[in-house]
């Protein structure tokens, strides 16, 4: 059965001067008290079953509840002050529609304020709204203003129903409320609660507006409407959740103490976040942290919390194993109990005589040790008489001892003045107020006797286990705990903050638990040696009964070469084992008895001065030489041999080591002798490796690469990248077990993560890709257009909450790319027109580069310092906020620069389209009338048709095969003689003479004759000579004719050449002048090109410097990983592999200090560079405005010359400007006049030039002229160019340096100021020496290109000199050809030609007559033929049929 017991507390109401109520009712809530019970039941619903706890908070109280009734008015409101919380309720008794009125609650704060606005729509799902925004909220509203438009950057903008389940029938059963704190706001609405964490300042002032209570009466009384309950202090209620029933009752005694000390354990063993941790201390084995935050492993995971109401006179026993958890408050865990914490709650009064007389510790082996304290020095006989450990404040010093059988084994020290907490671990550590008071062997159970105590005190017993948590400590006590048990909490731990602001955070490396061991060694024949070391301890008691280890304890080494003092390893492998014995003696140093009870001891070998631990020798440590010795002679270092007792460790002997570093000898866990390859590989999983002596943790994967040289391969920082298995030559890669990622956190929740590998992380399963990284998110990228492809900002329509560089993340986890601001309108030129350049000016294009932004850098500090080593990460937390400061400095700098760059850059879509190569190749961007022309890259290719081969169907050339088979002779021909000749001969040599050609009436033959023609004509000549005497000389006629024809060909060809020579000489002499003039222009062009290349080289040098500066810094930062900073190694894994944990921590601490120093230097350099870029960005903005968008009047600002126009283009990390300027090539020297002084009778006046851009000067002809200062254009001055001044006197003011501030108030002598600073700091001022290493990764190396440009510039300059000489030589070169004589010969036809013509005529005329008269069917010849046919005919043969083809098989 549920019950409620309440305490009536009367609290005053504080209100402002304006309280416009016609009637004010102040009374209890009456029969509506069940509202408070319902509220507390909902509030305590988060409590675990089996809970009994006192709740203390700014809860609603029974009274006062107020109701303000006034006439209808919209502009009246009630003001309440100094509130901590406010609750209100709507009374529904006898209410009608006229009674339903609105309410506007305003809680004022800075910069955020809260409003809760309620309408009259009681049955609506959105009848009210809550707003937590920046701004000044209105005190009253209108019926339709259900928005948060009054504010900006709202933390909460949520509409909710007035009544639960959107039903008016449920109204009046739920309280509405607001609580506000410095770091959070809690809102209770329609049965649901909202908690929003953020920092804010609250004034405690609340206004209640729109309470338009009606004046209508129901049953003769005014109807109660809105009731409200102001809360000014904390109220306490007790909630008991047993057997499935929750009972709420009033807390009447020790309420505040119960809230401060008793909590309900949450599921999973977690302590509630609102617990005060009263009297809970940070357990430490060394120094105590006073105040601060750190991530550490502490016993804060509660298996059971047992509240004990008061002490009883009885002995209680608490065991670590098998403890009964039947009285636990809240959740119960079955984990192993590591520490039992006794939390004590007392007043500040002296508590002597109240507490435990003695704590009994049952250690391993059955030995019971007792801890007790005394108020003065005591003797042996009084140790067990009046000892005690008082709980609370003591009235004097207490001296504490460890006792065994009533005998003091060890003096512990003085008890703290006030004992608040005692914690005892199962490993034998005894803590008082967090400090390790005593350590012994492991403990099984604890028991102590309790003295009579008061009933008004209570305490708690917490069975806890170790867990990693972020602990906030103030005045040595724990005040807040954040468990590192989730992804977002891990980020909180790495950032050392319980509340994460919106932003990107590096994901801390997860701890690598137990992993397999991978070993890679060279295959060889191994021999193995087992080294057994026997240590015999001698123990005896002191005069006070304490155990003492005798220095007569002996160490026995194996015998080697009859020597038992030195033992050297002579095999390839060895394993070392230690055997310990213990004997005790009385007073005679004769150790014969077994060690029992407190004399029981175990031999341990500590690190001593060696750079490796004894217990790590079998962990694959390698040496070239290794010897153990009992003598210090020749030793390199020593181990300390100690006897470990229940009280302490006592060093008895030293074991010396002689060693040399190398790989010949290796320590192994077990015998592996013989021919073996002892390599053990665990692929594709996280493994602890030792590869050829290099240790670490990573993932080993097989690759397909082939490398001929090397066994293992490392990075610049010394990290192992891969290795080769010499047996099969396979190359394996070694990568970290996890990689760094950047998590996007919004409102304390991880919504996305940026990573370099495509693998799920942080519980995020949805992903997309970008050109540079993978992005995992809570946003469901299920669209095929976005999943697995580069996401575009248009794919997701949301407003980014956090930004970094050009990316942003929305609240829903979606990733968007932030483009620069877009401008509207088309691209238009600034101006158009023709520019006339004077002859004494030349145009130069000068290149200038200005850096606009830097590439943002994010460094995972813990990854850089510790490389994922878990132990190193714990040590790193001791440096408090070092990593957080470094990471935040880089993140804030990047965000600031991103905002400035975004606000600076604007982009036009059309300009971007024209700047694209693909769009520029498209003819659509050009004039439509030219679209039919071919276009590539913006260059018209119509002219290429004249130089490309055409498709001709007539073959006018021989093939390549024909060129190989025939000899090709090229000669000069006459017109079409050669072509006609070839066509006539058809390739037959005998037709040579027949196909002779005629050119201008002269018979010619081609001048070249092949071998066949020469043979033919030679035979003709020889025959003619031989037969000449016999009358056969006519045979040689063809030879003579052919020779003469070819001679004619040569003569005519010579004539043509003579004409061509005349034409060539005339044209060449005419071209010499043009060539000379052209070379002069080329000379000038090359000179300007040389200067242009020089400016381009300078600009590229700046680009290279900007791009590589950050790379050099990162390279230098990477190189620092090679430094060991006086540690034994730069590898953290190697240090922990060689040393015991305590010694290794000291060396790793040196690495942490050194690497943090390197990181700080890098951050300082980065921030300094960002400051420089910020100034450079402003300069670029000024140059765009003045040089690109307009024409600068400043000489030298937009290029070194008179500015014409400038173009800007993108460049790596900045902008590159192309300035077109006028550079003077000739100068005119004039004497400038400041003005003219004129005399007019007795009056003197002056004239000065009105336009300061003009210069007045007097020319050689004694006339005055005006000319612009930018270009020499003298003109005669006019009266309108001058302004008259009163006189011609020039006044000078003589002043000393001390008088300048009175004349020029803002004058500062910079030189003197700097000189004073240098004088003040010169004694302690030295110049730092900075060294830089060469960066060999992602390095923009333009040195070769710049050198090449400079070389070309110099070469072009030299070319101009050479061209000047060549121009002079060309001017001296004129063609004077010797003319060939032209002989004109008139050739007449010879007599035999005429004779032949006559014979032809005489012969042809009779023949023609005969053919016409005698032929035909009626002619003489026809008749004669018919007669002869009949007489001379022969017998005709028969016609045969054609023979067919016959196939014979």
Curated annotation (Swiss-Prot):
It comes from Porcine transmissible gastroenteritis coronavirus (strain FS772/70). S1 region attaches the virion to the cell membrane by interacting with host ANPEP/aminopeptidase N, initiating the infection. Binding to the receptor probably induces conformational changes in the S glycoprotein unmasking the fusion peptide of S2 region and activating membranes fusion. S2 region belongs to the class I viral fusion protein. Under the current model, the protein has at least 3 conformational states: pre-fusion native state, pre-hairpin intermediate state, and post-fusion hairpin state. Homotrimer. During virus morphogenesis, found in a complex with M and HE proteins. Interacts with host ANPEP. The chain crosses the membrane at residues 1391-1410. Residues 29-1390 are virion surface. Residues 657-801 are annotated as: Interaction with host ANPEP. One of its GO terms (biological process) is receptor-mediated virion attachment to host cell. This is Spike glycoprotein. Residues 1104-1148, 1338-1380 form a coiled coil. GO terms for cellular component: host cell endoplasmic reticulum-Golgi intermediate compartment membrane; membrane; viral envelope; virion membrane. Belongs to the alphacoronaviruses spike protein family. Keywords: Coiled coil, Glycoprotein, Host membrane, Host-virus interaction, Membrane, Signal, Transmembrane, Transmembrane helix, Viral attachment to host cell, Viral envelope protein, Virion, Virulence, Virus entry into host cell. Residues 1411-1449 are intravirion. Residues 17-776, 29-776 are annotated as: S1. Residues 777-1449 are annotated as: S2. Residues 1-28 form the signal peptide. It comes from the Viruses. It is a single-pass type I membrane protein. A motif (KxHxx) lies at residues 1445-1449. Residues 1022-1043 are annotated as: Fusion peptide. The KxHxx motif seems to function as an ER retrieval signal. CDD domains: TGEV-like_Spike_SD1-2_S1-S2_S2 (cd22377).
